[in-house]
Every structure is written in C-alpha cells, then in structure tokens.
Amino acid sequence: MAKIFEDEFMEAQADMVSICLEYVEDDAEKIYIYASCENRAITGDYFYKINGQIWQRHHLNRIPGKNYDVSGERQGMCMRILLQDVQKIQAVCKTYNQPMPTQFKLVYDVAKNSLDAHYEYENQYSYDPVKSS
C-alpha cells in the first residue's frame, strides 16, 4: 500500500517523539516538543514532565535519584534529529502540495501513548517587531 501525506507527516513526528524519549531513557510522563519553521529558519526545543514537574533537557540531573547523559553532544544529537525531522516534514508537504506549518507544539503522553499536536500556519515571529531579533 502506498504511503499518503498523513502517513509520512506522522512518521516524521513519531521520530521526533522517539528521539526525545530515547534522550530521557524512556523515563518521562510527558514530552513537550516545539519547532518553528519560518523564512528558511528552523528552530526547536524539547522538555519533559517527570515526577509531576516540568524539566528542561539540560536540568534533568537535578531530579533526585536520576542520572541522565545531558552532555552538549547528546543534546546536539537530539536537536539535529528533531530539525532533520522538520526538514522531512517540509519535503513531505512540498511533495504532496500541502501547506507547511510554521509552528509545531507537540505533547506526547507516555502512559497513554498519545500525541496532542497543535500547528500554526501563519508566521509567528518573522516581521514581528517584538518577537523577532
């Protein structure tokens, strides 16, 4: 059976969740992923809910009893994969002549194995005198 737009789009998002889950050694309640793609600039971030609290990726070892590899190398590897996945989504949107989101907000609930996704299609930062640098 041939893949369709939705399959390829979701496959890239699933990879984003997978790499973030791997980064935290499958030990999170929720994973939050943010990506922005405007005017050829792609940015992103990811953070976690662990033990009922929100933690940035570089602060995970502040969690009592936890010891993660939060090295710059590991964070960079995860970020590279996230941004490559956004580029894959760009290619999928182009292939299927679909609009490309300018902003992704993904929340993955580990226990429920469910993904809540919110997309914006208008520029959020470009040309905004306050939000852009």
How would you name each of these model-derived features?
Residues 1-103, 107-133:
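Contiguous interface-forming segments/domains that mediate binding rather than catalysis
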